[in-house]
């Protein structure tokens, strides 16, 4: 593999030296070679000097990122030295329920699946959360806990909500318009802080891994507004150096019709030159860190302003977006689903679909490429063209 990497690097130097863009690509590759390490090791390296690590999740629907997240949790160091993981997904008042699910033993796999689905039907303030990676994550975490003497505790940070207490569309509107929802980043930060303060220290330290979507993870404030993102709140609460924010590789998600590659594809091209070997690295004072951040809503920021590090795990053209949880809408649950659908859709001023249309929205398993609306092949070719043009 080292010979192939050296070959690609020579190609860059020899064939692209005349182009301004090639110099930038060479800088990115050199930076990765000099500063990076394996993603799991990178996360634990951050924990050596910081108590809280935030992973900025890419598209909520992507399943490949949870392969990495479960690898981190599966590492013996996590249960022994960290012990606590928090997620954006999941209403805070369901935290005790999810830990009962994850820390007890079930006689059969089917018994766990039944308990998991029963829990999932009440975890979120949407009629149902349809992202399959939630099943993937909770199954994986249950398996880790089942085989470990040291158990991992999961904290849920989203708004307090119970479908049992919502009877009308107006009641749902009142919830949706509440300050807790309007300022979700503040709400999730507060919920984390309350649970974090109650953690049992391990080796004299409280440590935690937080998984939240990329926009929430930002160390940023909306330009001209007094509205911090979750990452910004956490750094203010616990200290700039005590909280480390790491972004998973993704696209410039704000342009959803095109989903352009970051830095015109140079980051992905550098990853390609490294034969897509996963890596994590700090980005301060690197070409990655000096790259302007693509979302102008936060002002004139660079990547090193909004995050401490990046992880490249899977090339963009291998990401898989999956929705639908087969079997989540059982016959016994159909009536309750339609009750929620009527309330939710009326509250959102949308036409209420019949059961035959509503049910597949949540339990029909559907996967498509993470490059959507572009094809994986076209994105891969675009990236490789940057190396060989």
Label each residue range with its predicted role.
Residues 19-389:
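Structured catalytic-domain cores with a bias toward divalent-metal coordination
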